[in-house]
Amino acid sequence: MSDLVKTALSLVPMVVEQTNRGERAYDIFSRLLKERIIFINGPVEDSMAMLVCAQLLFLEAENPKKEISLYINSPGGVVTSGMAIYDTMQFIRPPISTLCMGQAASMGSLLLTAGAKGHRFSLPNARIMVHQPSGGFQGQASDIERHAQDIIRMKRHLNEIYVQHTGQDYEIIENTLDRDHFMTAEEAKMFGLIDDVIQYRAETKKEEKD
């Protein structure tokens, strides 16, 4: 484990709860998981995807009907890792609410728009970026050709996913994703990537009565 990772882990705050059996300490992310909140933070890669998928499956096993909240602040990353999270989101039974805080770029934007219809949000100062997949290859010419064919096939498949979740025509998605395309939260809403931009958390009925 790198020194940077060790330092980051040591900075995760702990929270203490009073229970019938006395005090119990949780790291902040474990405590939020009890509230069915999962974070996608940083680059999307295999280790992070494994943890996110495991949390999704655990929360489904705990309650297959109760909503799960996915908070996203990610520059994107590995397509296959992102697709593992995406497929798990579609596979499990609980509805999933997504919220962008900071940024949702590349695969992060796909996971943002993959939330349940009507439950895809962004904070007002977040930014969303969409683009086509990229990759670099080396080796024999025939191998490079096969990799190129695969990435073109992957590009089409990702375009179809954006079409499904945004309601845009395929040609619009293809043209928009041709280069890095940055959007404000409001622009992402107009494009169909999200359903609403929220600045303040709505009060619950219990809070209103109090």
UniProtKB/Swiss-Prot annotation:
Top-level taxon: Bacteria
Primary localization: cytoplasm
Pfam families noted in UniProt: CLP_protease
GO CC, alphabetical: cytoplasm; endopeptidase Clp complex
Listed EC numbers: 3.4.21.92
Entry keywords, A to Z: Cytoplasm, Hydrolase, Protease, Serine protease
Its job: Cleaves peptides in various proteins in a process that requires ATP hydrolysis. Has a chymotrypsin-like activity. Plays a major role in the degradation of misfolded proteins.
NCBIfam families per the UniProt record, alphabetical: clpP, PRK00277.1, PRK12553.1
Record protein name field: ATP-dependent Clp protease proteolytic subunit
Organism: Bartonella bacilliformis (strain ATCC 35685 / KC583 / Herrer 020/F12,63)
Organism lineage string: Bacteria, Pseudomonadati, Pseudomonadota, Alphaproteobacteria, Hyphomicrobiales
Gene that produces this protein: clpP
